[in-house]
């Protein structure tokens, strides 16, 4: 499925409703250039979960949001240079958590160990002043 958004607000509103019911157990991998909308798209999912303050974990690498029955992991691998480094921040344990929703920005390093049966891929592109998102999964 390919979607086009003319504004960040429209992208957030779409992603807020698209992920209902909540996709517990899914691993979302978000690829695309800097500023192409990956974090903005995830803001909608975060709003659906009731998370009002949502930022990219570029420097912490992993943000964890705890809920009663599950966790939401937001992972940003932009600054991670190897699979070993991903493992050092608990990456393998996170990927094995079936009672969670996991979103990984800049996922290239970890793709070889992401369980394919749980994978949902999103590819973002800047087109003019808007954004195009290709969804697979």
UniProtKB/Swiss-Prot annotation:
SUPFAM superfamilies attached to this UniProt entry: P-loop containing nucleoside triphosphate hydrolases (SSF52540)
Record-level Gene Ontology MF annotations: ATP binding; metal ion binding
InterPro entries with a match to the protein in the record: P-loop_NTPase, T6A_TsaE
Keyword match Metal-binding: yes
Gene3D superfamilies, alphabetized: P-loop containing nucleotide triphosphate hydrolases (3.40.50.300)
GO BP terms: tRNA threonylcarbamoyladenosine modification
Keyword set, alphabetical order: ATP-binding, Cytoplasm, Magnesium, Metal-binding, Nucleotide-binding, tRNA processing
Location(s), subcellular: Cytoplasm
Binding site for ATP: 8, 35-40
Broad class of where this protein is predominantly found: cytoplasm
GO cellular component, one term: cytoplasm
Annotated family: Belongs to the TsaE family.
Listed NCBIfam families: T6A_YjeE (TIGR00150)
Cited function: Required for the formation of a threonylcarbamoyl group on adenosine at position 37 (t(6)A37) in tRNAs that read codons beginning with adenine. Is involved in the transfer of the threonylcarbamoyl moiety of threonylcarbamoyl-AMP (TC-AMP) to the N6 group of A37, together with TsaD and TsaB. TsaE seems to play an indirect role in the t(6)A biosynthesis pathway, possibly in regulating the core enzymatic function of TsaD.
Protein name: tRNA threonylcarbamoyladenosine biosynthesis protein TsaE
The species this protein was found in: Borreliella burgdorferi (strain ATCC 35210 / DSM 4680 / CIP 102532 / B31)
């Amino acid at each position: 499925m390919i979607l086009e958004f003319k504004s960040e607000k429209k992208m957030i509103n779409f992603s807020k409703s698209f992920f209902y019911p909540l996709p517990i157990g899914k691993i979302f991998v978000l690829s695309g250039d800097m500023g192409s909308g990956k974090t903005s798209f995830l803001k909608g999912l975060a709003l659906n979960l009731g998370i009002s303050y949502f930022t990219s974990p570029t420097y912490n690498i992993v943000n964890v949001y705890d809920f009663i029955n599950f966790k939401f992991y937001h992972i940003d691998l932009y600054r991670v240079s190897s699979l070993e480094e991903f493992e050092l921040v608990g990456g393998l344990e996170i990927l094995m958590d079936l009672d969670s929703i996991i979103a990984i920005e800049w996922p290239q390093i970890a793709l070889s160990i992401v369980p394919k049966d749980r994978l949902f891929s999103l590819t973002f592109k800047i087109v003019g002043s808007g954004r195009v998102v290709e969804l697979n999964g």
